[in-house]
């Protein structure tokens, strides 16, 4: 009997921009590589299915910025995985997202395809600190993204925050925590 794999992590290395603090493997842009990458990822899943029973409890898409994939790419990837994996015991399907890459149509598709939790890389609710971090979104856009995700049906959101950003004051951190709690992710 083959071993059963219960937890899967897929690294989607594509990003709209390299943030100065990032130490992960990323490809900025990379549009010309995306299709080949997704084909290779699904081929790897096919290969793994020959050796293991893939019946995950959790699936996590990290990066990079998985939400930077275009709608048709996300549909291809998620539909391809749904066709290849036994999801009967799936408890959580998480995807990391940058607020600048989520619009209503993408949020609705992600929810419809079974993503149960979005991990939103807000990092801060302070525009000055977001500039220090080199983020491509601002605080208002991040807050709007939370609303878009709620409207799409997401009830489980994770909001990533960064502490000890250069120049960050205790007051800014307290404000960030208060804002996050008020949004009830």
Model-derived features with residue positions:
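N-terminal [4Fe-4S]-dependent radical SAM core
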Residues: 1-9, 52-55
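Generic detection of intrinsically disordered/low-complexity segments and helix-coil linkers/edges
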Residues: 3, 8, 18-19, 31, ...
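Structured core elements
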Residues: 9-11, 119
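Local cysteine-cluster metal-coordination motifs and their immediate loop/turn environment
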Residues: 11-24
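Conserved non-cysteine loop/helix-boundary elements of the Radical SAM core domain that shape
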Residues: 26-51, 55-185
């Amino acid at each position: 009997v083959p071993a059963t794999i219960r937890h899967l992590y897929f690294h989607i290395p594509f990003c709209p921009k390299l943030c100065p603090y990032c130490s992960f493997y990323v490809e900025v842009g990379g549009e010309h590589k995306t299709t080949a990458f997704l084909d290779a990822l699904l081929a790897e899943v096919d290969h793994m299915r020959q050796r293991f029973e893939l019946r995950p409890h959790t699936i996590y898409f990290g990066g990079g910025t998985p939400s930077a994939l275009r709608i048709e790419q996300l549909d291809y990837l998620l539909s391809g995985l749904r066709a290849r994996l036994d999801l009967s015991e799936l408890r959580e399907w998480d995807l990391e997202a940058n607020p600048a890459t989520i619009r209503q149509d993408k949020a609705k598709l992600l929810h419809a395809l079974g993503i149960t939790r979005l991990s939103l890389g807000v990092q801060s609710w302070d525009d000055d600190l977001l500039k220090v971090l080199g983020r491509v979104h601002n605080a208002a856009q991040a807050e709007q993204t939370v609303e878009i995700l709620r409207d799409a049906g997401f009830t489980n959101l994770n909001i990533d925050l960064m502490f000890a950003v250069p120049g960050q004051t205790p007051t800014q951190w307290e404000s960030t925590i208060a804002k996050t709690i008020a949004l009830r992710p």
